[in-house]
């Protein structure tokens, strides 16, 4: 019997709701269900909390199925309103805090917006992350080769293999200064490592992709073009992989990995520190 059903899932917080989303998604991924996600950040007063409660109740009365509610709310009066709803409510942070409180014999001091908000203690980290994002945008797709020595990692690969989204994820999620450099069709007749990258070989990391997947992605961008042909994609991938092997550049095939997985593998292989924000 197939127990998979459609469920409405709420992620609610008096802050950004990022924590509720991340932990809630992790939990829901364990179940064979199709979900409709509703994220409601900054539920900071009773009026908004009552509106959220009404939204949860309306879905319950429409579907006859209790919405799942993952919440992270500091103020008890706001929590109380959400708990009065027809949803199945789970305080995802408290589920972890309570046993830790017992283990450490220490009372928590919850403060709204502490996880992702700005305060004097994390302002320098925030500025560093913004600087990493600015750097990554300025060094996307080989736009600029200046200050490459300031990069923490330089991603290489053919067009449309995932360099840009991975670079941006590294910058936004971990504050990593990630440049990326494309190998284009004109490079393939005599593909060599550019002179500007040779002194930085310890920072280079290659991405590759299955030619069939690459062709499908390129076809969406330039239909019926040589650029998107399977023959061209096979040739480019083969040449780039040979370059990686020749120059002993670490690399992975991005075909079956999400951006999050690719970024995590890069951090691990390159020994880069994970800095969460």
Swiss-Prot record:
Family named by the database record: Belongs to the pyruvate, phosphate/water dikinase regulatory protein family. PSRP subfamily.
Coiled coil (residue ranges): none
EC number(s) from the headed UniProt entry: 2.7.11.33, 2.7.4.28
Alphabetic keyword roster: Kinase, Nucleotide-binding, Serine/threonine-protein kinase, Transferase
Main EC class the enzyme belongs to: transferase
The keyword Kinase is assigned to this record: yes
One MF term in the entry's GO annotations: phosphotransferase activity, phosphate group as acceptor
Protein name as catalogued: Phosphoenolpyruvate synthase regulatory protein
Domain of life: Bacteria
Protein role: Bifunctional serine/threonine kinase and phosphorylase involved in the regulation of the phosphoenolpyruvate synthase (PEPS) by catalyzing its phosphorylation/dephosphorylation.
Binding site for ADP: 157-164
PANTHER family associated with the record: PYRUVATE, PHOSPHATE DIKINASE REGULATORY PROTEIN 1, CHLOROPLASTIC
Keyword Nucleotide-binding tagged: yes
Highest classification ranks of the organism: Bacteria, Pseudomonadati, Pseudomonadota, Gammaproteobacteria, Enterobacterales
Catalysed reactions listed for this entry: [pyruvate, water dikinase] + ADP = [pyruvate, water dikinase]-phosphate + AMP + H(+); [pyruvate, water dikinase]-phosphate + phosphate + H(+) = [pyruvate, water dikinase] + diphosphate
């Amino acid at each position: 019997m197939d127990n998979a059903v459609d469920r409405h899932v709420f992620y609610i917080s008096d802050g950004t709701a990022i924590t509720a989303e991340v932990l809630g998604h992790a939990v829901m991924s364990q179940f064979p269900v199709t979900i409709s996600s509703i994220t409601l950040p900054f539920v900071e007063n009773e009026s908004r909390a009552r509106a959220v409660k009404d939204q949860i109740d309306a879905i319950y009365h429409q579907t006859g199925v209790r919405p799942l509610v993952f919440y992270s709310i500091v103020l008890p009066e706001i929590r109380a309103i959400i708990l009065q709803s027809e949803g199945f409510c789970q305080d995802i942070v408290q589920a972890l805090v309570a046993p830790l409180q017992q283990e450490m014999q220490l009372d928590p001091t919850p403060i709204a917006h502490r996880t992702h908000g700005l305060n004097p203690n994390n302002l320098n980290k925030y500025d560093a992350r913004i600087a990493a994002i600015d750097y990554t945008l300025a060094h996307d797709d080989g736009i600029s080769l200046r200050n490459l020595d300031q990069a923490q990692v330089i991603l290489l690969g053919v067009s449309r293999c995932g360099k840009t989204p991975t670079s941006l994820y590294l910058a936004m999620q971990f504050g990593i200064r990630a440049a990326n450099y494309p190998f284009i069709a004109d490079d393939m007749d005599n593909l060599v490592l550019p002179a500007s990258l040779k002194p930085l070989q310890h920072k280079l990391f290659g991405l590759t992709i299955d030619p069939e997947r690459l062709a499908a992605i390129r076809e969406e961008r330039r239909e019926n073009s040589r650029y998107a042909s399977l023959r061209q994609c096979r040739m480019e991938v083969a040449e780039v992989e040979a370059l990686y092997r020749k120059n002993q550049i670490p690399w992975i095939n991005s075909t079956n990995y999400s951006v999050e997985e690719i970024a995590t593998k890069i951090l691990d292989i390159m020994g880069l520190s994970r800095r969460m924000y």
